[in-house]
C-alpha cells in the first residue's frame, strides 16, 4: 500500500503550499503562474462542459414549487406503462432521412410517419441517444466511438438536427397521443470538455471520474501512449502493479468489450497532461466500455457526477420535453475491493442508491425511467424497490430465442418460474424484439448463481452448467457455417431478428432468398412479436423489425469493425417510409440494409404484410388491456415446444391465455387453466369467428397449434357479458 496516508496528510492538503500546486501528489513542481492561453482554454472547455450546463440549469429549479407536484419516492411501473405501452425504438445513425438535406430528427417528426405509427398502435418513440457525443481535441470535436453512447454535451448532435427540431418531434408525437423517450447515461461520458478539464485538474472536475493521479515516481509503471492517441490501455501486469501500490482496486473478474491488444483491461492511462495550474500529470482511469468512455465516480466528496447526470435528466424532461428516460448501463455505478479481496463492481449497492436518486428526480418532474442492463433476478428485485419504474427484459429475451432456435421452451419456462420466485412482475418489463445491441446471451442470473442447481430436461444442472449448455446451443445455431451472416460479439451474437429467424429455418445464403423464404421468415418474426406483445408491460420493436432488415455484410462496415465491435452489422440503415429510395446509406454513414418487408407505406397498403398483421396483434392487446394484466400461472406442459401463460385481465374481465408453439411440429395437448370457472369458453382473440373452445369439467383446455403458431384466448366466466 502507499505509505502516504490521506488522513495523515490532511493538514498538508489544506495548506497554502498544496493549494499552490507544490504538494507530493501534484507532479513536477512548476511556477504557479498559468499562461493566459491555458486559462482561456480552460474557460472555453468549462463553458461547453456538462457540469457547467447542469449548474446553470439547476438555478431554474432550486427553490421552485415544481419539485413538489408529483410523488417520487417509489417506482410507478403501472403509471409508466399507462403512459405508453407500445414503443418504437429508433437508432438515429441508422435512420435514412426523408429527403436530401432533411435531418434525422425532422424525419422522425414527419406527419406521415406518425400517422403510420398510430395505425400500427405505437404510443412512444425511444429516440436513442441524440446529444453531442465523442470527444474534444484542442478546439475541435471528435466523432462518437459508440453510437452516441459517449455523451459530452446537453446539446443536440448537429448530425441529427437541432433542439428546435427535437421539440417539433415531441409536439408531433403528442398530437398523435404519444410520447418521446430520451436517454441518460449515468455510468460514463465521452472525452469531452468535462474529461479534458478533469485531466487538467480544473476545479472539481477530477471528482467526476473514477480517475487516479499517478505519482511521477511511478510513471515507469505506465506504458507510453502511442503516437496519435491520448491514452493507452493497461496490461494485466500493469493493473496488478498499480493495485499493489494502492492506486486502484485492480482487475475486474470479467470485462466488457474485451479485445486482445485493443482492450486487455478496464483501465487506461492518459499521456502527460499539463494542468490548469501548469503542473504535469498522468492519470489512470476506469472504463467498463471503450477507452473513450471514462467511468463516472458516484461517490466523491464533490458529488460532481450526481450533479452532471441529474442535470442531464432535468434537461431531457424540462427543456426537450421527453416523457420518459432510459438509464443506460445503470448497474455499474460503484466499485470496490471487498474484504475478501474480490473486486466488486456488478450489482454494487451504490448503483441502487444512484438509481434511486436519478429515478426520484425524474419522477419529481413527472417523468418515468427504465433501466437497460442485463441484471441477475435478485439485483432486479432490489432495483425495483426504489429505482427505475421499468426494466428491459434481458431475462426472457435469450430464453425465447433459445426456444425458437431449439424448438424447446423448457429454458423459457424455467426462467418464468424463477421470475415468479423472485417476485419479478412481467408487467414492469419492456419486452422487446431487436434493439441496437447484440442478442445478449450473458444470462447473468445463472452466472452469479453458478453453483446453485436448477431443474432442466429431467435432471438438475448447476447455474454454470445450464448457462454453458444454453449458450452453446444458441451459438451452434446462430454462428459459423450455418449462419455466416451473424457474428459473435462479447457474450452474444450480432444479428437482426430476421437473421435469427433465418438461422432457425436453416437458411444459409441470404442472397438467394425466394418469396417463400421471406414469408417463412415473416411468419416466425410475427411469432416472436406475438410472444413479446401478448404479455403485461411494454412491447417494443425497432426500425429493423418493422422493415425486416438483414445484417450488413461485414465488408461494408469493415472500418467500424476494426476495434472488434461487430454490432455494426445489425445496425444497417432503413427508410421507414420509403421516401428516399436513392439513398444508399444513412446520414450516419451506415449502408442501407436489405429490407425484406418493404417500407411502412407499402406494408400498410396490404392487409397481409408484417406491419398490418402486427397492427392487428397490437389492437387485440389494447382491447384486452393486456398491458395492465397480471401473470397468474405458467402451466406445466408435456410438449417441449409448447409455452403457455395465463393472465388475469384488469377489472375482473376474465383470463387471457397466451399459447405458443416454438416447435416445428403440430401440438395437440390438454393444459390445466387455474382460475377458470367450469363451463367457461375460450374465444380466439385474433380469430373471433373461430368456434370457441370449451373448458372441461377438470378445468383443462385442449390446445391445438400448428408448427410455429400461436393463439391468444380470452376466457370469460359463464355469467359474464
Model-derived segments and spans:
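Surface-exposed beta-strand/loop patches in extracellular or lumenal glycoproteins
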Residues: 662-678
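Boundary at the C-terminal end of the N-terminal hydrophobic targeting segment
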Residues: 17-21
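C-terminal beta-strand-rich structural cap/linker in extracellular carbohydrate-active enzymes
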Residues: 695-721
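Solvent-exposed beta-hairpin/edge-strand motifs
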Residues: 673-689
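Bacterial N-terminal signal peptides
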Residues: 5-16
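Acidic/aromatic-lined carbohydrate-recognition and catalytic surfaces
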Residues: 23-306, 315, 332-406, 412, ...
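Loop/helix patches that line or flank the sugar-binding groove of alpha-linked glycan CAZymes
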Residues: 423, 429-656, 662-666
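An active-site-proximal structural segment forming one wall of the substrate-binding cleft
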Residues: 304-324
